[in-house]
């Protein structure tokens, strides 16, 4: 075993973890830690970065709900120690160093841990400048961010009832989902025993789905009219050919986008799917690295990029990816349901409000407990979100309140583990 002690400086740090330049002031990162809370049942991971300036701290979203404990451990054991002692203004150098330091890089666990630090440093930067973060990114490109919400039911009528409620609240953009045999959706249960003569009677059949989805949107246009923008999430369960079949069947109903039509393992086929689809293709929430996002945009695989921004490493890489979108005519539609913390929403909004590539923003209505844990949580008004005008993200965390909602054994993995066909075979989630 090689003795590397001769490489260490007196503080115990490897020399390359400390920059060869002198900071213009004595401000330093003093502590980095993960905070896990679940005010709506889904674990949210937020990173807090404290500094030597008493009261100056930042928050960042590191939420990977299905592996929250792994992310929290990565923050506390690996990411944080490499940042302590650094000047919080050195965001690019700190995040690149930590990205390189694992040698095997990227992936949703390490990228979410890095995102928590990265976003927290941007929060600190905004507070030091006395500016909201979007002003650090170039300022406004629009007054507010237009959002979409979800309508889902076990029947077409139930789904459209929810859609009408959203329209009454001021939404112009609604994603429609329908439960069915073997598969529920967003709080709407699926039906059991749909295939009683099959080896797995409670299964889900793609053929039935391909018949039901066009019926849903035909009924939606008839009942909701033409003024509402409609979307749909496939959840990665189709082959490339099936994706094209569905897109063509939905063409008469003028969807704003069709989401996650194929599994990430098949993303090399997206350019051909998009070329054959009359409906805009929105993909990206399952991307876990910057190179994967770049390939989607560069190679013509998407019309709208749906990043889960913490899964690619935070604001720093996201703004670079979005710059590429601006140059290549791809629009954004960031992932942001209940498994994105209010801090993550604030980071999304900073990009949304400042980029000319903005398309849509997914939204979620947080419960009262989440507002208690995260003072400053943004609220949808007439189908729009407005960024905070306070310095940084404009979001705080009440750690006493957060402690009232510890994570428990999380059942979200039931759907994310996939569904089974009537023959018992496993399909993607």
From Swiss-Prot:
Positions that bind D-arabinonate: 235, 285, 306, 335, 362
Keyword Metal-binding part of the UniProt annotation: yes
InterPro entries given in the database record: DgoD-like, Enolase-like_C_sf, Enolase-like_N, Enolase_C-like, Mandel_Rmase/mucon_lact_enz_CS, Mandelate_racemase_C, Mandelate_racemase_N_dom
Domain of life: Bacteria
A Pfam family annotated for this UniProt entry: MR_MLE_N
Alphabetic keyword roster: Magnesium, Metal-binding
Keyword Magnesium: yes
MF GO annotations: magnesium ion binding
SMART domains in the record: MR_MLE (SM00922)
GO BP annotations listed: amino acid catabolic process
Residues binding Mg(2+): 233, 259, 285
Region of interest: Disordered: 1-22
PANTHER family assigned: D-GALACTONATE DEHYDRATASE-RELATED, STARVATION-SENSING PROTEIN RSPA
Family: Belongs to the mandelate racemase/muconate lactonizing enzyme family. GalD subfamily.
Known role: Has no detectable activity with D-mannonate and with a panel of 70 other acid sugars (in vitro), in spite of the conservation of the residues that are expected to be important for catalytic activity and cofactor binding. May have evolved a divergent function.
Name the record gives this protein: D-galactonate dehydratase family member Caci_4410
Native source species: Catenulispora acidiphila (strain DSM 44928 / JCM 14897 / NBRC 102108 / NRRL B-24433 / ID139908)
């Amino acid at each position: 075993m090689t003795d590397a002690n001769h490489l260490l400086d007196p503080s115990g740090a490897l020399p390359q973890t400390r920059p060869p330049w002198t900071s213009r002031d004595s401000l330093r990162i003093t502590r980095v830690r993960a905070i896990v809370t679940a005010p709506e049942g889904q674990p949210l991971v937020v990173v807090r970065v404290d500094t030597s300036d008493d009261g100056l701290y930042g928050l960042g979203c590191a939420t990977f709900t299905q592996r929250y404990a792994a992310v929290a451990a990565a923050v506390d054991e690996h990411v944080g120690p490499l940042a302590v002692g650094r000047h919080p203004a050195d965001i690019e150098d700190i995040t690149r160093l930590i990205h390189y330091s694992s040698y095997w890089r990227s992936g949703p666990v390490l990228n979410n841990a890095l995102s928590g630090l990265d976003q927290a440093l941007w929060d600190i930067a905004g507070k030091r400048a006395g500016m909201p973060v979007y002003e650090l990114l170039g300022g406004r490109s629009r007054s507010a961010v237009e959002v979409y919400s979800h309508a889902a039911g076990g029947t077409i009528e139930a789904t459209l009832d929810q859609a009408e409620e959203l329209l009454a609240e001021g939404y112009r953009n609604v994603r429609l989902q329908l439960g069915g045999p073997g598969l529920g959706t967003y709080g709407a249960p699926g039906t059991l025993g749909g295939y009683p003569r099959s080896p797995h009677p409670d299964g889900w059949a793609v053929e039935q789905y391909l018949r039901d989805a066009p019926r849903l949107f035909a009924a939606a246009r008839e009942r909701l009219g033409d003024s509402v923008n409609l979307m749909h999430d496939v959840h990665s369960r189709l082959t490339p050919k099936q994706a094209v079949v569905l897109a063509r069947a939905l063409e008469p109903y003028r969807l704003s986008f069709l989401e996650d039509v194929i599994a990430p393992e098949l993303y090399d086929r997206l350019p051909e799917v998009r070329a054959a689809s009359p409906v805009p293709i929105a993909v990206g929430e399952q991307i876990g690295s910057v190179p994967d996002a770049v390939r989607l945009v560069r190679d013509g695989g998407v019309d709208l990029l749906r990043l889960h921004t913490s899964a690619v490493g935070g604001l720093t890489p996201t703004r670079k990816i979005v710059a590429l979108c601006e140059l290549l005519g791809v629009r954004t539609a960031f992932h942001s349901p209940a498994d994105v913390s209010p801090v993550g929403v604030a980071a999304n909004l900073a990009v949304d409000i400042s980029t000319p590539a903005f398309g849509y923003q997914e939204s979620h209505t947080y419960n009262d407990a989440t507002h208690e844990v995260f003072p400053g949580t943004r609220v949808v008004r007439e189908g729009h979100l407005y960024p905070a005008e306070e310095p940084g993200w404009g979001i705080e965390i009440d750690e006493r309140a957060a402690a009232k909602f510890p994570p428990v054994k999380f059942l979200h993995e039931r759907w994310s583990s996939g569904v089974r066909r009537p023959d018992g075979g496993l399909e993607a989630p």
